[in-house]
Amino acid sequence: GTCISYYYVDLLLEILLKPAGKLYYMRPTEAFFTYMKVSVVGGLVIAAPIILHQIWLFVKPALTVREKQLSNWILPVAIGLFGIGIVFSYFLVLPAAVKFFMGFATDELQPMFSIGQYMDFVLSFVLPFGFIFELPLILIILGYFNLITSRFLKTKRKIFILISFIIGAVISPTPDMFSQTMIALPMILLYETSLFVLAKIMKR
């Protein structure tokens, strides 16, 4: 996966760097290590579906008929949601975040991003959304096995909103409230979506 990613690393960097425009590297090794980091992360993303499929093949013999039926659609849905989360973050959240922070520029104060620092910001901002978008799938699976109900989710709504902002503060690449809110809001919307879908499923 890493070899494939490295082959296309220039294209990947062009895509990832687009929201910020021109960047600089402050240390002789900074550009090289940024290339390596993007290649490794890209390789992990490429390899993830294969790894998950191998894990599924390993545990499949021990599953019940009901669990096997459920697992047939879990993997493709999980991969799809992860991809949607990445795309959502890149096209909507990341440009808004970059624009917000560049808005502090003045005639005397101009932004000059380091490629290493910017790439750390991008990866720590974009990748978590892939996992955040798995939330509906996790909650629906728990509901499928009667471990939670839509009523339970309704009663825990306020707690989840608080948890969303705490998670936003933990995984946000910067300590400001804007970044935390940009992470927390999609989590809350996904929670409400999960609640709605779970309520529909339970009525059937």
For every predicted segment, state its role.
Residues 1-204:
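Membrane topogenic/interface segments and analogous intrinsically disordered interaction regions
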